[in-house]
Amino acid sequence: MPGEQKKVCIDVPYIDQSKLYPTGCESVSTVMLLRFLGIDITVDEFIEKYLEKKSFEERDGQVYGPDPHRYFCGSPYDDESFGCYAPVIREALEKIIGAEYTVTDETGMTTDELVEKYIDQGMPVIYWACINMRDPILYR
């Protein structure tokens, strides 16, 4: 029927991050995607072997963190960590899959565009969002 929306359900293996990886949503989502592609890897293996991580530093009573575009800030095992952005995960994925697949950073693409280009075609995506899909807080 015209105007009817189709539903696409992609059978991606679920991994619960809540107990072991409180700030590891990027890592857990990446491993879920890799398992969907048939690559047998654990979340711990991904974090320890492939994820670029850097700790926070304290200087003169101030805490400084690394660039989240280059590193996971802190540790996915620590509930006080910050996380990372798409370039860090893209680089980790490229180390694992090599030339077998193409990894594309689609930062800035709308949800509808991601659905049409990937999910409707049966390909899962790794999606960055704020808790409860609220708008991000931007600092200048």
PLM regions: where:
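Short helix-loop-beta junction
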Residues: 92-99
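Short, well-structured beta-strand/strand-turn elements
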Residues: 99-109
